């Protein structure tokens, strides 16, 4: 039988330090300096500190299956060696998990090594963070820089993100593309509070799920605050989504709902409230039911219904070449909308709007 001293020495050698434990108790606090040590020792720790970890190429920082109630702290600078692969760079699951960043920490993905202006095409790029099965948990105060591709893939119930910074500003000039901040699917109860995002795709994309709340967001440089695309997935229901008190600037779109042509599903109980836009290049408000192979066709279908949509105090300006509002619905599939204090200026009026409820203006 190994002595406690020998076990402790082994932990130090392997990139792990254990504290607050006796030989027969689970360790309370662990500091890991390598991804391998974190994966091997995570189940024994109620508090995990990830200290200046450099994740090897083609490897996930694997924090799946954490013990309920575990606290995870990112400390120092977390980095990732280069390989063309699908990722994710980090994956985490468990219940009642609390994730925070220590003062001065940075999760630096150095995405420019992968960026080629082609996003999901071109060279293979890893997604950043899978929050799949990270239930009844919270992620607070993380500082993330230059993700190669999408940042958070969220498939979880009762999860809250607070004060998360995703700074992919370098991607504006270095080929960043498809760098979505929060992609939500198959989730019930997702709260995203005061995020700061500069990226080159959706600030928020809700593809399926219920009870989603996004508030106090700052969204710069991307594709705006989106529902969809909805359709052609195993789950094609989006219900009870509130997006409020947020700004969207220097982006392609501000408010967007899009559904897949020929698909079935439903989008309902959607509220956009107190959204301020500026510097929008394509559409201020766009709701369209004609997406196919990732592109609009101009031919809407009605298999995915869009009901009980409320826009209130959605204001601001778009570029002179942009369209202020574009509403393209299938026959009878858009209904029960509320439209209050929607004022988008600076651009063109659309002449191609179709089948939208009379309370809206186009």
Curated annotation (Swiss-Prot):
Residue ranges annotated as propeptide in the record: 22-27
Record bears the keyword Disulfide bond: yes
Residues at the active site: 201, 223
Main location per the UniProt record: secreted
A GO cellular component entry from the record: extracellular region
Disulfide bonds: 30-45, 203-219, 329-334, 353-362
Glycosylation sites: 240
Signal sequence annotation: 1-21
MF terms (GO), sorted A to Z: polygalacturonase activity
Signal as UniProt keyword: yes
Subcellular location as annotated: Secreted
InterPro entries referenced in this protein's UniProt entry, alphabetically: Glyco_hydro_28, Glycosyl_hydrlase_28, PbH1, Pectin_lyas_fold, Pectin_lyase_fold/virulence
Annotated EC: 3.2.1.15
UniProt entry keywords in alphabetical sequence: Cell wall biogenesis/degradation, Disulfide bond, Glycoprotein, Glycosidase, Hydrolase, Repeat, Secreted, Signal, Zymogen
SMART domains registered for this protein in UniProt: PbH1 (SM00710)
PbH1 repeat windows: 156-186, 209-229, 238-259, 267-289, 301-322
Consequence when changing residue 202 to N: Reduces activity by 99.9%. No effect on Km for substrate
Known catalytic reactions: (1,4-alpha-D-galacturonosyl)n+m + H2O = (1,4-alpha-D-galacturonosyl)n + (1,4-alpha-D-galacturonosyl)m
Biological process per Gene Ontology, one example term: pectin catabolic process
Task of the protein: Involved in maceration and soft-rotting of plant tissue. Hydrolyzes the 1,4-alpha glycosidic bonds of de-esterified pectate in the smooth region of the plant cell wall.
Family, similarity comment: Belongs to the glycosyl hydrolase 28 family.
Name used for this protein in its record: Endopolygalacturonase II
Organism for this UniProt entry: Aspergillus niger (strain ATCC 1015 / CBS 113.46 / FGSC A1144 / LSHB Ac4 / NCTC 3858a / NRRL 328 / USDA 3528.7)
Gene designation: pgaII
């Amino acid at each position: 039988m190994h002595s406690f001293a020998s076990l402790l020495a082994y932990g130090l050698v392997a990139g792990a330090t254990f504290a607050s434990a006796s030989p027969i108790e689970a360790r309370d606090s662990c500091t890991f300096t390598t991804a391998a040590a974190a994966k091997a020792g995570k189940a024994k720790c109620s508090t995990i500190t990830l200290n200046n970890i450099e994740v090897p190429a083609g490897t996930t920082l694997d924090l799946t299956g954490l013990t309920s109630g575990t606290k995870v702290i990112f400390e120092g600078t977390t980095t990732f060696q280069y390989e063309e692969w699908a990722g994710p760079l980090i994956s985490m699951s468990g219940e009642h998990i609390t994730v925070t960043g220590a003062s001065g920490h940075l999760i630096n993905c150095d995405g420019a090594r992968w960026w080629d202006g082609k996003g999901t095409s071109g060279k293979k790029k890893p997604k950043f963070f899978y929050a799949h099965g990270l239930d009844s948990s919270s992620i607070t105060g993380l500082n993330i820089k230059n993700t190669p591709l999408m940042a958070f893939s969220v498939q979880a119930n009762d999860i809250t993100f607070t004060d998360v910074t995703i700074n992919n500003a370098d991607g504006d000039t270095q080929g960043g593309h498809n760098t979505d901040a929060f992609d939500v699917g198959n989730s019930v109860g997702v709260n995203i509070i005061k995020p700061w995002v500069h990226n080159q795709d959706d600030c928020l994309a809700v593809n399926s799920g219920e009870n989603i709340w996004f508030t106090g967001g700052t969204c710069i440089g991307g594709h705006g605050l989106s529902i969809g695309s909805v359709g052609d997935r195993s789950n094609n229901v989006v219900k009870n989504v509130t997006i409020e008190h947020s700004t969207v600037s220097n982006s392609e779109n501000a408010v967007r709902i899009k559904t897949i042509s020929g698909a079935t599903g439903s989008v309902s109980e959607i509220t956009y409230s107190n959204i301020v836009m500026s510097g929008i290049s394509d559409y201020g408000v766009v709701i369209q039911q004609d997406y196919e192979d990732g592109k609009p066709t101009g031919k809407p279908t009605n298999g995915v219904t869009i009901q009980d949509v409320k826009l209130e105090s959605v204001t601001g300006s778009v570029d002179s070449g942009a369209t202020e509002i574009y509403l393209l619905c299938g026959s009878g599939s858009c209904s029960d909308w509320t439209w209050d204090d929607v004022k988008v200026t600076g651009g063109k009026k659309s002449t191609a709007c179709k089948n939208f409820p009379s309370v809206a203006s186009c």
